[in-house]
Structure formats: C-alpha cells, structure tokens
C-alpha cells in the first residue's frame, strides 16, 4: 500500500473515532434527559394522585354539608 492510501485510511479511521465519541456523548446526554423526564413524569403522577384525593375529599365534604343543610331545612319546616 502506498503512503497516501494509509494517510486516507488513517483520516477515515480518525473521523470514525471522532464520530463515535460524539455519538457516545450524545447518548449520555439523552440518557440524562430521559432520567430527568422520568423523574418529572413521576412527580406529575404523584401530584395528580394528590389532586384526585383532594378532589374526592372536597366532594365528600360538599355532600356532608348538603346533608346538614337538608337536615336543618327539615327541622325549620318542622318548627313552622
């Protein structure tokens, strides 16, 4: 093989190595981003569950107050 062919081959190999290194860095960045998104998704799920529980609690409180009001109105009608 001639010296020129070896130089071209070396340049191609170096380009491939550089490309692989860049791709590895990109993969690491994507892994970190994925982990951050998974964490954020988990936090959002937990927040949604907390809101759903609070909404259910408020509905129960609302129903209890409605029942109390009905009871008081019934007592007022009995007094009249």
Curated annotation (Swiss-Prot):
Residues forming coiled coils: 3-80
Location(s) in or outside the cell: Cytoplasm
Supply the Gene3D superfamilies for this chain.
Answer: 1.20.5.340
UniProt key word Cell cycle: yes
Q: Which Pfam families match?
A: ZapB
**GO terms classed as biological process:** division septum assembly; FtsZ-dependent cytokinesis
- This protein's UniProt keywords: Cell cycle, Cell division, Coiled coil, Cytoplasm, Septation
Q: Which GO terms describe its cellular component?
A: cytoplasm
Q: State the function annotated in the UniProt record.
A: Non-essential, abundant cell division factor that is required for proper Z-ring formation. It is recruited early to the divisome by direct interaction with FtsZ, stimulating Z-ring assembly and thereby promoting cell division earlier in the cell cycle. Its recruitment to the Z-ring requires functional FtsA or ZipA.
Family recorded in the similarity comment: Belongs to the ZapB family.
Subunit structure comment from the entry? Homodimer. The ends of the coiled-coil dimer bind to each other, forming polymers. Interacts with FtsZ.
Protein's name according to its UniProt entry: Cell division protein ZapB
Its taxonomic placement starts with: Bacteria, Pseudomonadati, Pseudomonadota, Gammaproteobacteria, Vibrionales
């Amino acid at each position: 093989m001639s010296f020129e062919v070896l130089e071209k081959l070396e340049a191609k190999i170096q380009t491939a190595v550089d490309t692989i290194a860049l791709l590895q860095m990109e993969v690491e960045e994507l892994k970190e981003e994925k982990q951050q998104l998974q964490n954020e998704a988990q936090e959002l799920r937990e927040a949604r569950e907390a809101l759903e529980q609070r909404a259910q609690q408020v509905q129960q409180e609302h129903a209890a107050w409605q029942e109390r009001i009905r009871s008081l109105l019934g007592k007022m009608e009995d007094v009249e």
